[in-house]
Structures are given as structure tokens and as C-alpha cells.
Amino acid sequence: MSEQHAAAQDVWERYEDEEWRQDQSHWRGVGRWKDDKRWQAIGKHTLSKLRATWRLLDRPHFPEPFVALEWGPGGGTNLFAMQRLCRTYYGVDISPSNLAECERMITQEGHSNLFTPVLLTAQPSDILAIVKEPIDVFISTAVFQHFPSKEYGIEVLRAIKAVSKPGTLGVVQIRYDNGNEKFRSITDLSEYRERHITANSYQIDEFWKILRDTGFSPLMIRDINAQVNYATFIFHCT
């Protein structure tokens, strides 16, 4: 296990306040997510972005059922939103607890064979041993900001490229770096535990270039939120 992976797992699986960890991981019925409409809204918004992008690309129809992969599914709000649209939904996480919660939640919804958990044990390329079919959709919301380094995020994109095919659509939310000290990336792994909420950020043009360098074609940037420095990148595999 790499030092970066161990530092992240120490927070996202073994944090001393489990209720807080579940809230930050978007578990249904916990903390802020006791409001179920608010919890479901996250997944609905992600799905609306996918549908809008499909129209932007002038593709004839939304591919149903499709194969999706989410990096950092947490408590499964995106999984919940897409449960009737997918034939396979891969959830990649460093937290066994989060993956177990996704399985519990989606089984309770009557789709026990839909979700395939992918537990990372060392590095992002771990997924290549489990994801054996090309994916149609890649999703990652409010996760890249928690990565222990910019380079880790690049490795994630390389792993995703390896399981993509021409036409694979990606939706990734990042925290962008505009010089605000609050959102600067950490420079040493020793900072991670204290600053895991704002550990990683990219300049807008930097992340656009990273997508191109890892084999994707960026399409647009949307949902820029200047209060928390969020930006969502839409891209596809050519």
C-alpha cells in the first residue's frame, strides 16, 4: 500500500468520528442527508448533466442499459439515481464501509446484482484487475478534491482511460485553484489529515490539459461555484 493511499484510507475508513465520516461520504439518512430529497438531489443533478451532454454530442439516444463507473461513490446517491439505467455499476473506493453501504442501499431498492464494488488496496490501477468490460460513463463528484496529490488524480484518469472506449462520457467535479489560500493543494502528505477536505485542487486550464494528456477530449466546464471553488468538467474518450 502506498503512503498516499494509506493516508487517505486513514481518514475515509478509520476516522475517529464515524458519524461525521458517513456524513462527509453522503450516506443516506445521516447528518445532512437525513433530508432524503437533498440526498437524492445529488444523483438527479449528476444524471441531468449526463443527459444534457448526450444531447450536446448529438447522439441519437441515451445508452440504456449502460455500464457506469463511479470513483468515490460514498453512500450511493449517484448509484440510486441511475439504478434503472445501468446493467453494471462499478463503485471504486478506498473505504470498505462505503462500498458495503452502497451494496446495502441498492439491494434494499431491489437491485442486488447491479453494483460491483471495487476496493482499492494500493493504487488507482487496481481497477484493471476487476473492470473487465469497457465503460460507457465515468462519474466522480466531490472526490478529486480529497485526493492526496495532483499526481494521484492523474493516475486515476489514466486508469479510467484504460477501461474506456471511444465515446465513453466523463463527468468530474474538481476544486479549482484560483490563488485562494484556503483551497491550495497540500504540498506534503503530513498535511493530509488536517486538510483532507481541501487537500487537492487544480487550475482550470491545468485540469483541461491533464484531461487531454491522459487521452480524453474536454467538452465544457459547467457548474462553477465561486463560494467553494467547484467546477465540473465534461469530457469524452475519442
Task: List the predicted regions and their residue ranges.
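A short, conserved alpha-helix within the catalytic core of class I
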Residues: 147-159
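Residue-level marker of regulatory loop/turn positions in helix-turn-helix DNA-binding domains and
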Residues: 132
